[in-house]
Amino acid sequence: MRFSHRLFLLLILLLTGAPILAQEPSDVAKNVRMMVSGIVSYTRWPALSGPPKLCIFSSSRFSTALQENAATSLPYLPVIIHTQQEAMISGCNGFYFGNESPTFQMELTEQYPSKALLLIAEQNTECIIGSAFCLIIHNNDVRFAVNLDALSRSGVKVNPDVLMLARKKNDG
């Protein structure tokens, strides 16, 4: 077999194996998934039986990790959405925002027909308006901040221990 054929076969093997390697979630993606799962599992909705439907905007860097089946089951039903129109008809109990601005997050909440919504943002570092929970991602470390005003208006109940955890992580 000629060298060029061997090189070609090696290249084919490498390229076909690349998608398998690329699908392995990174540590930060796993940490985001664990954080979101934890927040959802300590949240209660009035008049909801069964797992909540979490709509994940496709702009999220971690949309794949938040929806894929892993060794642990998810405490929510993930639905990927692309537009505000999809969000309005999705029947979600919560939203996970990617690049959507805090203003967009507020406007969607005001227009959405549901009274009880859990809102988690990936790119809302100030956490002053918009979502109730804002992820703070630095390298592989994932923490969160809580917007108590947004949470009090959300219609969902969150275990107070989660709020204390956010406070401890932000203080230390």
UniProtKB/Swiss-Prot annotation:
* GO CC aspect terms: periplasmic space
Signal peptide per UniProt? 1-22
Q: Which InterPro entries match?
A: YfiR/HmsC-like
Q: What keywords sit in the KW lines?
A: Periplasm, Signal
Q: Does the keyword Ribonucleoprotein apply?
A: no
Q: How is its activity regulated?
A: Inactivated by reductive stress.
Q: Where does the UniProt annotation locate this protein?
A: Periplasm
Q: GO biological process annotations for this chain's record?
A: bacterial-type flagellum-dependent swarming motility
Per the entry, what this protein does is: Repressor of the cell division arrest function of DgcN. Prevents DgcN relocation to the midcell.
**Protein name listed in UniProt:** Protein YfiR
Query: What organism is listed for this UniProt entry?
Result: Escherichia coli (strain K12)
Gene name tied to this protein: yfiR
